[in-house]
Amino acid sequence: MGECPVNHTKSANVAGGGTRNIDWWPNQLRLNILRQHTAASDPFHKEFNYAAAFKSLDYNALKKDLTDLMTNSQDWWPADFGHYGGLFIRMAWHSAGTYRVFDGRGGGGQGQQRFAPLNSWPDNVSLDKARRLLWPIKQKYGNKISWADLMLLTGNVALESMGFKTFGFAGGRPDTWEADESAYWGGETTWLGNEARYAHGQEGIAGKGIVSGDESKKNHTDIHNRDLESPLAAAHMGLIYVNPEGPDGNPDPVAAARDIRVTFGRMAMDDEETVALIAGGHTFGKTHGAAPADNVGAEPEAASIEQQGFGWSNKYGSGKGPDTITSGLEVIWTKNPTKWTNQFFEYLFKYEWELTKSPAGANQWVAKNAEPFIPDAYDPNKKHLPRMLTTDLSLRFDPGFEKISRRFLEHTDQFADAFARAWFKLLHRDMGPRSRWLGPEIPSEVLLWEDPLPPLDHPVIDNNDIAAIKREILATGLAPQKLISTAWASASTFRGSDKRGGANGARIRLAPQKDWKVNNPAQLAEVLGALEDVQKRFNEQATGGKKVSLADVIVLGGVAALEQAAGVSVPFTPGRTDASQEQTDVHSFEHLEPYADGFRNYGHGNDRVKTEQYLVDRAHLLTLTAPELAVLVGGLRVLGANYDGSDHGVFTAQPGKLTNDFFVNLLDPNTEWTNVDGKGEVFEGKDRATGQKKWTGTRADLIFGSHSELRAIAEVYGSADGQEKFVKDFVAAWDKVMNLDRFDLEQGAGSSPKL
């Protein structure tokens, strides 16, 4: 029984108010992330097709309107230096920069900067104003441009309006309509805290999240060697990447470089891309720290209703323009902050730097023995000394970063090219394959991080060919469960977060996937060898230029085996192609390897995450609903698809047949379960009356009888009339997973992305 969670404050006594289940049982398995971004929250009907709407957009007119906005300063939020470029670059960067490679979550693909918690992060102070400046343009073009696309395109246009040649831009990011609860942003409960993500981190502040000038006075013990918790890519709760004052506010550029390298690396950036992004972004605009943070009001989610979504009201002076407080730092990097120059590197290496304080009390650096020549953002008669952030100096004082920075100083063309490419990658890393990309500015050069696929340059197989290939596959003598396991292993790498993985490309035959333990490499090699022979024979005999890819044959093998096991027809859509090893970034794909995969009874939980939580996490990446999760696990078990061929969860007397036996036997009240491994991971089911052993199962199996919501679903499939529905639903869910990465089949359908 849970302990009383009442905190003696009165909650709203209306629908949705009061003590919730999570208050009573905070460790309860939650399925909420499997119910997000559905039609219930989407104001558009299913008929709305964002890709079609985007194609009807007057793209050039939109870009002109955005360009005009850059210098159309508004009295309610005036533009620094008469140009909003720096603000909009930051908006785009902070939208896309939440991406992390470990699970593909974050990024700009959902337009989540509009929602909590991102809209109220300390690092996003004043971006509420940036989005409001954009509203008249969004209002004008309506559904033809999503917020997700508009925020990133605006950053691109900002760069172009200040003389920078960008690498290109692709649209195609449908909006979502609610806060995404799937991303783990950290376990801290105060802004700027990091005590949960680092072994010796610090608690944050209870205020509004502006940089504290006193932060660096804390005791810091591990800033030169600490390890950031996975999957996080930010050093503090509420920051996009690192503390600009230095680790935990400590103004140490070398230690800051370590944090930079880790966090940018977890956003899929290497050292050159990291240096280019920091220096390129800091070529423009300024930071804002006109006065201490105690002048700043509540963030948007905590602000009063009359603020209408604005936050961080500022009582210092006018509260805007020269009196703006954003980060608490007050730095203008270059003499020409509204133009593309190489001045960031010129000043970085020209001057020696000494530590100083911003008007808000934050640590920053000022050039020694320099004359004031940096322009003021609002007073043409006022000049400033050159200033830098601790994290800027990291690009000079870290040996690896310094080498790149000096090269960029001497070769401005290399700097411009590196920044253009890194910026494009930042904005598009979670876009998925090019079949999702829209617009007239898609670059012709194909980049390795796109996980490129060869084009489909031949006629695809027809129904007669499909039937013949299925017969050939079954004639190989491969056990059906091996064919099903291989097809599932190939397709289930897909991540709806960043649209990576999936069966298309047949990358399961390439490094690193071919060697993953979860894929049972010995069995995989056997199956792939036989399927490659089938593919080769067909392609040698086919006429009219017709071919079949191994990617298609792998999926077709699973389909053939499933049809044999279920006695029903299973859909199949050809058209996949085969990627090469040269088109596959091994290091990047290593992040797709599962730590635990409950669908195949692989791996288990730890002292932080339970096995069943990993299962739900994986189901979310596969864009599954709770019923789809249940029916797939139940079906894969009776089909014998455990990664190692074990009997765990195979609750049937007729393995290999697609029956609802998993649910029937799991729900049998005559079975008594006990833990047998001493770790709470493996269990044995015995007949209550005789004590005879009947089954073994894992947490990923027993959760469907233990968890009240999953049990409710299991009871549907385990009922006397559940078999027909079970088979129908399993086949539908199977087909969905096999085609998760086939954006070429129905490009852009629906207003919401596959999440």
Swiss-Prot record:
MF-aspect GO terms: catalase activity; heme binding; metal ion binding
Record's cofactor remark: Binds 1 heme b (iron(II)-protoporphyrin IX) group per monomer.
InterPro entries linked to this entry: Catalase_peroxidase, Haem_peroxidase, Haem_peroxidase_sf, Peroxidases_AS, Peroxidases_heam-ligand_BS
Cross-linked sites for Tryptophyl-tyrosyl-methioninium (Tyr-Met) (with W-93): 241-267
Catalytic EC class: oxidoreductase
Post-translational modification: Formation of the three residue Trp-Tyr-Met cross-link is important for the catalase, but not the peroxidase activity of the enzyme.
Entry function: Bifunctional enzyme with both catalase and broad-spectrum peroxidase activity.
Subunit structure: Homodimer or homotetramer.
The name this protein goes by in its record: Catalase-peroxidase
Species annotation: Podospora anserina (strain S / ATCC MYA-4624 / DSM 980 / FGSC 10383)
Lineage, opening ranks: Eukaryota, Fungi, Dikarya, Ascomycota, Pezizomycotina
Gene: katG
